[in-house]
Amino acid sequence: MLYKGDTLYLDWLEDGIAELVFDAPGSVNKLDTATVASLGQALDVLEKQTDLKGLLLRSNKAAFIVGADITEFLSLFLVPEEQLSQWLHFANSVFNRLEDLPVPTLSAINGYALGGGCECVLATDYRLVTPDLRIGLPETKLGIMPGFGGSVRMPRMLGADSALEIIAAGKDIGAEQALKIGLVDGVVKPEKLLDGAIAVLRQAIDGSLDWKAKRQPKLEPLKLSKIEAAMSFTIAKGMVAQTAGKHYPAPMIAVKTIEAAARFGREEALNLENKSFVPLAHTNEARALVGIFLNDQFVKGKAKKLTKDVETPKQAAVLGAGIMGGGIAYQSAWKGVPVIMKDINDKSLTLGMTEAAKLLNKQLERGRIDGLKLAGVISTIHPTLNYAGFDRVDVVVEAVVENPKVKKAVLAETEDNVRPDTVLASNTSTIPISELASALKRPENFCGMHFFNPVHRMPLVEIIRGEKSSDETIAKVVAWASKMGKTPIVVNDCPGFFVNRVLFPYFAGFSQLLRDGADFRKVDKVMEKQFGWPMGPAYLLDVVGIDTAHHAQAVMAAGFPQRMQKDYRDAIDALFDASRYGQKNGLGFWRYKEDSKGKPKKEEDAAVDSLLAEVSQPKRDFSDEEIIARMMIPMVNEVVRCLEEGIIASPAEADMALVYGLGFPPFHGGAFRWLDTLGSAKYLDMAQQYQHLGPLYEVPEGLRNKARHNEPYYPPVEPARPVGDLKTA
């Protein structure tokens, strides 16, 4: 053994070839600060070996390196800019030393080589991979850019266009594409990876392969003519401006950095990468996006822990076909859990099967599946008008009309046709689960399972624990949701549960703004362009359905009369009474016409102004800041109340439910992250300016207490140790 660290070791393999093996404690390798330092120490040893002929990098895990240790990011990002810059210089000196070894180097990559893992293997001369490879640089999705030389080496290896596509989008790619664009040199079966790697190294050692020529372009300026450079970077900047927009600065900065560094050799190019990375790491966007990643890991880890002793359902059923039922059936079947889809109406069953078939055909068109796979999946969805086969069902989700009487009757009838251990769930969006459970003989086997539309796209499923829901029931439904590829978040029961309970105060803030003379078009524009929602409130109401919102508004008002009961006729009432139901019938706040692809496209409709004039004061202008405050304060207050009342268990779960269920702008990180970034004291000052607008604007007592001491909701993060300590960690 030449060197042994906590996460890697160095040893002779054979005849002058050394192997550097990543083998961290636990299930995966991460390129954390300690591993970077350890890699430097291994190179200290390696550089002294006079009989060294070649170096092989490999992993003892199922994946090569999954990336940097993102749990370190928030504390690293608090290190002063100069110190963070110094540490990056140190880290890059390690990768440069790896790249500058006077012998050929090869990475034998199995599974993932992402982020720092990808940057590490770019520093070697050759990359041999297994077919399950995923390689890429996802840093821009975290609000930063590559910092270990990825923005320097990748463009010089692949050319600007291919590298920009991966780096700006934060993409990872598979083995076939990586080989095609020249990111890897060969693909071999896992059992042949080591022998294949040694064979390539031997060819490089004996001169059959020119490893020095392979290395040289990475040390030089990017080979691009002025015209090529102008075209590549102009197109890339245009694409990034269109897709990322102003709220996500990292992709544009990455493109501009690669452009600026193109005319320099490695050292100066790395300095430019460093100068761009460090300010990005100190942005609120980076903290928010890293926070989302960590929250996602926390939520998924919680679901995994909850289901560790539970068998995943093998047979499911959906009650109620149509778009929602068809969407749930498709998702279950697509992920490998056969499903019976029951309805009392033949037409609905046809609609449900058509929805599932449509989604599968889209996968076929995109080349993700073949006809055989399509037929296999669709054959596991069984439409039926009766309860045949329900004795084999492990879990049933009800997705019938949003009416408590109908839901209770359907659930009670189903309970009589399933096994005593079968779990029942309701896809209700607002009706309290404990109320629906009153119709059942086995309420302990019942809970809520709230999917979001469209089911195949929306990652969140709210799992609602009723008063009598058992732990086993919750665990089974969480297991099914996880198997479906969804992110399940368990919440306690109340009208609207978590997501709709916090959404309707936001809509109420919108209604009050319109009542006071705001133009809904400006409100939509401000909430989309300035705050960053994917849709403004008027557009969102049209998509949800004005009739659906009108009904849900009444349910929420009955559940929370003190805050959500209104004493005036609002814009939603006016549109509902005029049968303007939104996208579903082409008229809402906006008018909708189908585009060439058959998708609804919104247009202005002057007719809506006269309807809204009946429920509004004369038009007046509101500043962007006032619109954002009046829209967001009711929502944030309600989110805080849900945490205080135990409806949601943690700020992390609340923020993920908002991002995954409502499209809360990820660069804000969720309501609690936004609140922490703003500061609770500053938020209280802002909210108090609007408390005259009513109970929705009254700040909860717990938040007032936080504001007195300006305390955050997330645990405070300590800055990483000084850079000198980081080097030798």
UniProtKB/Swiss-Prot annotation:
Positions of the record's site feature: Important for catalytic activity: E119, E139
Annotated region (Enoyl-CoA hydratase/isomerase), positions in chain: 1-189
Catalysed conversion reaction: a (3S)-3-hydroxyacyl-CoA + NAD(+) = a 3-oxoacyl-CoA + NADH + H(+); a (3S)-3-hydroxyacyl-CoA = a (2E)-enoyl-CoA + H2O; a 4-saturated-(3S)-3-hydroxyacyl-CoA = a (3E)-enoyl-CoA + H2O; (3S)-3-hydroxybutanoyl-CoA = (3R)-3-hydroxybutanoyl-CoA
Taxonomic superkingdom: Bacteria
GO molecular function terms noted in the UniProt entry: 3-hydroxybutyryl-CoA epimerase activity; delta(3)-delta(2)-enoyl-CoA isomerase activity; enoyl-CoA hydratase activity; long-chain-3-hydroxyacyl-CoA dehydrogenase activity; NAD+ binding
Keywords: Fatty acid metabolism, Isomerase, Lipid degradation, Lipid metabolism, Lyase, Multifunctional enzyme, NAD, Oxidoreductase
PANTHER family tied to this protein: TRIFUNCTIONAL ENZYME SUBUNIT ALPHA (PTHR43612), TRIFUNCTIONAL ENZYME SUBUNIT ALPHA, MITOCHONDRIAL (PTHR43612:SF3)
Recorded family membership: In the N-terminal section; belongs to the enoyl-CoA hydratase/isomerase family. In the C-terminal section; belongs to the 3-hydroxyacyl-CoA dehydrogenase family.
Descriptive protein name: Fatty acid oxidation complex subunit alpha
The organism of origin for this protein: Citrobacter koseri (strain ATCC BAA-895 / CDC 4225-83 / SGSC4696)
